Every structure is written in C-alpha cells, then in structure tokens.
Amino acid sequence: MTEHEQEGGPPSLLLGALEPLRATAEFASLLPASPILATAPRGSGEHVLVLPGFMASDASTVPLRRFLDSRGYRTAGWGLGRNIGFAAIGPLLRDLLARANDRAGGPVSLVGWSLGGVMARRLARNHPRSVTRLVTLGSPIGGSPTRTSVWRVYDRVEPGRRAEVDARYREPGMLAPPTGVPSSAIYSRTDGVVPWQIAREQPGPLTENIEVRASHIGLGVNPGVFYAVADRLAQSPDPWRRFRAPVLLRGVIDHGRSADGGPTDPGR
C-alpha cells in the first residue's frame, strides 16, 4: 500500500449520509439471496470469535453469527459490551482470546468488523498460534483510524490521542499482517465510514483483499459479505488459496485478489 493511499481523507459526506438507507436495503436483500447463500461452503464445527465495531455490541453481529451457525460454524460474540476503544478494551483482549481457545480446545478463527477487525488483527499478530484465520470487515488496518469519519466520536471517548495514534501508525511494522495466519480483508469502495484505501491488507503470501458492494453499516447484513466470510472460514490453511466469487454474486462481490493487487490464485 502506498504512502498516498494511507494519507487519504474520510469518505464523502454523501456516502456517510446514505449509510442507513443503504444498510436497510442490504438487509432486505438477504431473503432473495437466500438460495445463493444456501450454497456457501459449510464448516465442520470450527470455532469463530466475532468482534463488533466501534460503539457497537454483540447485537450488531447477530445476523452474521446466525448465518455462520447455520453453515456449520460455532460462533461466539465477544461478551464485552460496547466496543468503546483500545484504552478500555485493549487490556481485555488477550484474556478474551484465551477463553475462546479454552472453549475450542485450540486455535480459533477471528472475524472483526471495523474497529473490531483492528483488534482481531492485533490479536492474530501477537498470538498467531492461537488464531487459525482472520477476516476483517471494513477495518482501518492499512492506515491511521484518524482518517475515518467516526474519529470525531472516538476522540470524545478517548480525547487528545490523534497525534499519538498517527505517530504509532507510522512506526515500522505497525501495518504488517499477522505471520502465518491467512488474512482476508473485505472492503467496499463505497464505504461511508472507513476510506477503502486503508481497509485493505498489506502484501503477503497469506493475505488477500475482497471487494464487495456495501455500505459500512451494511457489512454485517450483506449477502456478499456473508458468502465471502463463510468461504474464507472454510478454506484450509494448507494449502491456502484466495477467494473466487460465485458467478451469481459477481455483481456484488469481486474475486479475492492478492494484497499487492495481483490476480486471484488461478489454481482454484
């Protein structure tokens, strides 16, 4: 990812204003999309921990978790209430992952939405042996979150941290993907909260970017996202292959691409 991409500003005010309406339409599209979603790859009881976005709670991830449960996964919310940021939640994350590992009897997959994805990615990077797979949804993993449209709200919760956060994201290795953990970043160019340029994963042999047509709020109720998440959770880490969208969903979801923009793995 280039320095220019990291320095982009927040999405347009129009995209932000349309978020609720677009998310409602995405939720309404789940029913007509159900025949396609019924073909999504099934799990075999794998444990999946789902982390919500900023100021959201487990209630926001219920639709996605119910769908994944219906496809044979064993999902769990994080049980920490509202996600009010790293200052309050950060110290609790390691214990959260440890409890999930205890329930599963081994490593688990992580799915994180927005800020939850940043937290999940940090867990995967710090504790790679405890994480099987990582999927982020519209998460600012490729640049400073001060460039998102919700930073003003975040600044009220944790005031005066802009300079500190920007400096931290300029540190060498801060944006590096987890080592040895397959990582899929799902993003939308029409995200009204997080600039799409910083919602993409860094280049690596186990990283990919999957583009969907979605609002930020709608990422948790979008048929294309549901299918892609189920597919990525079903993909074996060895050998790991990048995502290919089913024909009937190619209007709302793109093929997975290597994080450096290269083509999808032709062997799949």
Model-derived features: positions:
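A general boundary/transition motif marking the beginning of the first structured unit of a protein
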Residues: 5, 9-12, 174, 217, ...
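Short, flexible segments with low predicted structural confidence
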Residues: 39-40, 89-90, 200-201
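C-terminal catalytic-base region of ester-bond hydrolases, centering on the histidine
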Residues: 179-268
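Serine-dependent carboxylesterase/thioesterase catalytic core
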Residues: 46-59, 63, 69-180, 186, ...
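Phosphate-binding glycine-rich loops and adjacent basic patches that engage nucleotide phosphates
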Residues: 22-31, 51-60, 184-196
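Flexible, membrane-associating and regulatory peripheral segments of lipid-active enzymes
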Residues: 1-48, 61, 66, 71, ...
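Generic secondary-structure transition motif, activating predominantly at the C-termini of alpha-helices
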Residues: 22-35, 97, 101, 154-161, ...
